[in-house]
Amino acid sequence: MALKLVLMLMVALLAAVWSPPAVTASVTYDHKSVIINGQRRILISGSIHYPRSTPEMWPDLIQKAKDGGLDVIQTYVFWNGHEPSPGQYYFGGRYDLVRFLKLVKQAGLYAHLRIGPYVCAEWNFGGFPVWLKYVPGIHFRTDNGPFKAAMGKFTEKIVSMMKAEGLYETQGGPIILSQIENEYGPVEYYDGAAGKSYTNWAAKMAVGLNTGVPWVMCKQDDAPDPVINTCNGFYCDYFSPNKDNKPKMWTEAWTGWFTGFGGAVPQRPAEDMAFAVARFIQKGGSFINYYMYHGGTNFGRTAGGPFISTSYDYDAPIDEYGLLRQPKWGHLRDLHKAIKLCEPALVSGEPTITSLGQNQESYVYRSKSSCAAFLANFNSRYYATVTFNGMHYNLPPWSVSILPDCKTTVFNTARVGAQTTTMKMQYLGGFSWKAYTEDTDALNDNTFTKDGLVEQLSTTWDRSDYLWYTTYVDIAKNEEFLKTGKYPYLTVMSAGHAVHVFINGQLSGTAYGSLDNPKLTYSGSAKLWAGSNKISILSVSVGLPNVGNHFETWNTGVLGPVTLTGLNEGKRDLSLQKWTYQIGLHGETLSLHSLTGSSNVEWGEASQKQPLTWYKTFFNAPPGNEPLALDMNTMGKGQIWINGQSIGRYWPAYKASGSCGSCDYRGTYNEKKCLSNCGEASQRWYHVPRSWLIPTGNFLVVLEEWGGDPTGISMVKRSVASVCAEVEELQPTMDNWRTKAYGRPKVHLSCDPGQKMSKIKFASFGTPQGTCGSFSEGSCHAHKSYDAFEQEGLMQNCVGQEFCSVNVAPEVFGGDPCPGTMKKLAVEAICE
């Protein structure tokens, strides 16, 4: 018995020794920063929305974010993806939130979970499930019982799931922050006392879920304690939290802007993005999140707006396809390295601020063992030479220099050391098509007839983009237009977003709205004959609105009036007569986008310019690992499916309006400043995830609404075309600071894996002009500029290599071509 007791005691002691320690992690905050496990942190975050990429892409995206210097991955939670019908939840495929967060943890990063559950995000209906609109008595985002009950239930569902999976930092998981609501401040102002009451309820509800991590509210100046109010915008250096005990946080630093069908493509210069972030950190900010770090794709019908494009690239540091956008990714990576060198000083105390000139200033942070300085020139036109600590510093316009030891410049936001990459969409081949055209005279079994016009969303519940409105018009034989040939005019007024009008089975015309004005009026000649005439209006939605007040009041579809003018009687109002309605297209009912459903009809030879036509083909997966896309430039408007999965809507016929010109990083940025694609398709290429493909026999279906040319559709692959660098001979470098040594900066060039530099298109050490793709020699040029990259036997030879480095120094290029002049090296290499 004694022996047994001894053995039991030994087992107990061993268990105590070898049992894993209890989780003691904590996340709090003070006026300086978020505090993780007792340590103040400067946190760099980036938004990657899990449904906008495939699970197969997630590990690489997260790793590239980590390599870019990020500490945190931020994502919204998409209610309509997770609860498509009341009480029916889905967390699989692209909506596998738990898998995504575990990959974040596996990579050694934190997570910021923005539950919302309103997300905006240019996402269909702002993330709300459409069924929520039809809950009796509901009013969205206000002090309303039915809405609060549904919102609270979903929020608790997500929090409970996160707890069950051990995903909060206090459980050993990655989540260090959560968000409730989203940009509610402007709505609260509109809603008055009910809005204020709702804000307080939402905050109290969230905090009461006891996640163990702080909650934030963005664009919510009156966020109740202990919730932290945060900033969203292109710039947030001006922002201050509403209490002295809260840190200065930037939840959405917009890296670019979204693209709308019919709009140009916005781009934000890397220099300005870096300037905005450096200014925010300089002025006491401690958490910054790039919205977006990877934008991805609005697969299926998830794009909101309306009129938001299928691409959600956002000019993010990682592009829609998962490739690095250079120099933005590399320049921000270098910025993050510089900021991290300053972290001990930044979190220790308040800055000493000194004016260095009319538009120049210094912010100095000190700790017991460190000193960090930020020197800013916020003049948007002129360089400035400033004196700081007895030394002279040259500051380009609209820039910040970072000195992690208060002496040595390691980074300037306007001096880009990272390479610039130009991309190409390489043609891989076309397709052989079969076609099936919708019979506009045929109606499905799911039709109904009603006096007057119906609202589209309440009829379709967004199960389809399409709703047919069909009526009949009797024309007497004595109508004057039958003699003169001057046909009457049909006018259709719609709440949006597009209509295709068919008269007696023939397409008569099309009209559509825009991102800024989704409502539309169709007016066109109606070729009617004596007797009964069939008028069919196909109303098309292009994503549901994602921002605004009182979602429950929003309408789509043909609300009227619908009139005919030019008859003997003058005007005839058709709005109140009998209409027959059909939800969706016949091909949707038959599931023609699926391999099984496609066998339900007879397919014929493909023809061009045929409206409401389904096209199908089979193809083999292209070899290689490069991202793939479909070039849809010869088509009009419609949708695409591969192996039954929807790539999204396409609309290359909607050309981009706007003013596109040169882009200067200097000066305040907005979404209208740096535009491209004017006069061209807003979106030409549509991402085809490789993980959706099988080696052979992939099934591709295209639904064309207007009538395009399918013979012009092709598969392309996205890869690097050329790489460029432009580095000044005295450009600051991180390596020199670390080694406390003086050395020359280097140019680093790198093609994609599997590529090599085939030739040097341009090289000049001196005063070269232009930008990547259009460099030219300046008045000063070293005639041996090319030798450093091409001459055999040199250590830094680049031709034939995947990557290479070259010192930016006169001796490398045969001597100083212009003594006394500040020089730089510009180079462009072709990647094959």
Curated annotation (Swiss-Prot):
The active site is at residues 183, 252. GO terms for molecular function: beta-galactosidase activity; carbohydrate binding. Its EC number is 3.2.1.23. Belongs to the glycosyl hydrolase 35 family. It comes from Asparagus officinalis (Garden asparagus). Residues 741-832 form the SUEL-type lectin domain. Pfam families: BetaGal_gal-bd, GHD, Glyco_hydro_35, SUEL_Lectin. One of its GO terms (cellular component) is apoplast. It is an enzyme of class 3 (hydrolase). One of its GO terms (biological process) is carbohydrate metabolic process. This is Beta-galactosidase. It is found in: Secreted, Extracellular space, Apoplast. InterPro entries: BetaGal_gal-bd, Galactose-bd-like_sf, GHD, Gly_Hdrlase_35_cat, Glyco_hydro_35_CS, Glycoside_Hdrlase_35, Glycoside_hydrolase_SF, Lectin_gal-bd_dom. Residues 1-25 form the signal peptide. It catalyses: Hydrolysis of terminal non-reducing beta-D-galactose residues in beta-D-galactosides. Its main location: secreted. The keyword Ubl conjugation does not apply. Keywords: Apoplast, Glycosidase, Hydrolase, Secreted, Signal.
